[in-house]
Regions:
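Core AdoMet radical
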Residues: 1-64, 74-78, 115-122
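Conserved C-terminal portion of the radical SAM core fold
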Residues: 61-129
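Acidic, Ser/Thr-rich peripheral helices and adjacent loops at domain boundaries
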Residues: 131-135
């Protein structure tokens, strides 16, 4: 991240997205650049437990994103991939409520407005590729 940030600092016309599932706060010690967007991939905890083993919790990712927002960094929230599971609606509503609570706890009542944007995406692996993975 440090090297990408340094590169972006030298190329102001470049817009760089750093996509992450991290909860480490060291990146907030880097210079705050308007052309470097820190994009946090968020999933309901149930999905993290099932499909994203050994990655930080939803809570830890949201706390990290909130800290970046509070320090003025460009932050994007990515709900990608959204997976259709029987309880998807409840799971994602709980995740959105958790974001509201964490933003509120950190005095980021305007947190949603401070975000660069929010992206939503679906699972994009082709059926042919999935067949190969299952073999």
């Amino acid at each position: 991240v440090r090297l990408w940030s340094a590169y972006a600092a030298k190329h102001e016309n470049l817009k760089l997205e750093i996509r992450t599932k991290c909860a480490g706060h060291a990146m907030w010690d880097l210079p705050c650049l308007s052309n470097v967007i820190y994009a946090f991939t968020l999933s309901p905890q149930k999905m993290i437990d099932a499909f994203e083993k050994e990655t930080p919790s939803a809570f830890a990712r949201i706390v990290c994103a909130a800290e970046g927002l509070k320090k003025g960094f460009p932050v994007r929230l990515c709900f990608d991939p959204m997976l259709y599971l029987p309880s998807w609606k409840t799971d994602y509503l709980q995740l959105l409520s958790q974001i509201d609570r964490i933003f509120g706890d950190r005095m980021l009542h305007d947190g949603w407005e401070k975000l660069v944007d929010v992206s939503v995406g679906t699972f994009r692996i082709s059926q042919e590729y999935m067949k190969k993975l299952r073999r």
